[in-house]
């Protein structure tokens, strides 16, 4: 999960989770994954924890910058960067086994 959570970081994660756009993006991802059942990336995105998935999805699929994501959720860019790094490592590890 997330390393070295501080109270501030935990509060920021709560902001990410409660944003309506978070639910909308998760629904979009599920729908898109259903339309493309053979796409490993979409399946693995769905397997990420909700906080990480909510940050990685707009970064990878929508092409948003980390600054734009941080601004959208009103959290620090460091929180977004941490979640993106966690997501990158998890996806890299999961997708490496499917070569």
Regions found by a protein language model. Give the residues of each.
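Short amphipathic alpha helix immediately N-terminal
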Residues: 47-64
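Charged, low-cysteine interdomain linkers and short loop/connector segments
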Residues: 1-30
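Short helix/strand-capping connector loops at secondary-structure junctions
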Residues: 65-74
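DNA-recognition helix of helix-turn-helix
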Residues: 73-98
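Amphipathic alpha-helical segment used for protein-protein interaction
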Residues: 22-52
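Short amphipathic alpha-helical interface segments enriched in basic and hydrophobic/aromatic residues
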Residues: 2-3, 7, 42, 57, ...
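Hydrophobic positions on the alpha-helical face of helix-turn-helix-like DNA-binding modules
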Residues: 56, 69-70, 80
């Amino acid at each position: 999960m997330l390393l070295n959570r501080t109270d501030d970081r935990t509060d920021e994660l709560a902001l990410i989770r409660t944003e309506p756009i978070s639910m909308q993006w998760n629904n979009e991802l599920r729908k898109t994954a259903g339309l493309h059942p053979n796409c490993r990336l979409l399946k693995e995105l769905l397997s990420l924890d909700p906080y990480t998935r909510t940050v990685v999805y707009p970064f990878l699929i929508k092409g948003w910058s980390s600054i734009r994501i941080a601004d959208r959720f009103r959290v620090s860019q460091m929180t977004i960067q941490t979640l993106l790094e966690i997501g990158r490592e998890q996806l890299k590890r999961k997708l490496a086994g499917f070569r």
